[in-house]
């Protein structure tokens, strides 16, 4: 039980302190990558959706 509580606390701390990380700006040298960085968090969802499309293509065997 104690291990689960420790894990929850660690996750909460990470979520609280990393939230400011998501809103930081890229350095000027990498400013041209802003559009790519904005799309990157959505890429795993495309793979998730691709799994359903693939299963539909093979009739959910």
Swiss-Prot record:
Membrane topology value: Single-pass membrane protein
Propeptide regions on this chain: 1-24
Gene Ontology biological-process annotations: photosynthesis
Function according to Swiss-Prot or TrEMBL: One of the components of the core complex of photosystem II (PSII). PSII is a light-driven water:plastoquinone oxidoreductase that uses light energy to abstract electrons from H(2)O, generating O(2) and a proton gradient subsequently used for ATP formation. It consists of a core antenna complex that captures photons, and an electron transfer chain that converts photonic excitation into a charge separation.
Main subcellular location: plastid
Subunit structure as annotated in this protein's UniProt entry: PSII is composed of 1 copy each of membrane proteins PsbA, PsbB, PsbC, PsbD, PsbE, PsbF, PsbH, PsbI, PsbJ, PsbK, PsbL, PsbM, PsbT, PsbX, PsbY, PsbZ, Psb30/Ycf12, at least 3 peripheral proteins of the oxygen-evolving complex and a large number of cofactors. It forms dimeric complexes.
Key words, A-Z: Chloroplast, Membrane, Photosynthesis, Photosystem II, Plastid, Reaction center, Thylakoid, Transmembrane, Transmembrane helix
InterPro entries reported in the protein's UniProt record: PSII_PsbK (IPR003687), PSII_PsbK_sf (IPR037270)
Membrane-spanning segments: 40-60
Name under which the protein is recorded: Photosystem II reaction center protein K
GO CC terms of this entry: chloroplast thylakoid membrane; photosystem II reaction center
SUPFAM superfamilies linked to this entry: Photosystem II reaction center protein K, PsbK
Annotated compartments: Plastid, Chloroplast thylakoid membrane
